[in-house]
Swiss-Prot record:
The chain crosses the membrane at residues 11-31, 35-55, 77-97, 109-129, 140-160, 176-196. The gene is nqrE. It comes from Yersinia enterocolitica serotype O:8 / biotype 1B (strain NCTC 13174 / 8081). It is found in: Cell inner membrane. This is Na(+)-translocating NADH-quinone reductase subunit E. The keyword Transmembrane applies. Pfam families: Rnf-Nqr (PF02508). The keyword Plastid does not apply. Its EC number is 7.2.1.1.
Amino acid sequence: MEHYISLFVRAVFVENMALAFFLGMCTFLAVSKKVSTAFGLGIAVTVVLGISVPANNLVYNLVLRDGALVEGVDLSFLNFITFIGVIAAIVQVLEMILDRYFPALYNALGIFLPLITVNCAIFGGVSFMAQRDYNFPESIVYGFGSGIGWMLAIVALAGIREKMKYANVPAGLQGLGITFITTGLMALGFMSFSGVNL
């Protein structure tokens, strides 16, 4: 159990997708203007990561890995296209669910919801799973931990950006300029976790 808690904490803080690896920056910067929208996108990314990492783990270990289907047959050259296909299918199902049951959130996320399919944080989580050779339970923990970490980062940035609306930001830094500086400072804060050995 300790191993899974350690993996979860590492995925959330030490190896944060947004602030340690800078993955998913497009949606991270664009949707972090309001906390409510950022939280909704964070939940969507967490759900997609939490489902796609274990699903791709099964596909990788049962189909793509060297000798998984037939001895001597290595289908690992299909990793990227297969991983993207599984992620796209999961995002399509999530998009239909949000459209049906949460139309306000669906409209607020707009074009960024289908873009989760090509969000490099999602693909990064799946690629790290394959590269680090996680087993199925580890991939579940890592997927949800990575999603929670990304959500924590985007909600924190959205909260800071909401407060900065009332700040006297210099004209040259208004908009994305101060957002990049804020993201960098947040990343420095999260870097302090890198010394933690779990």
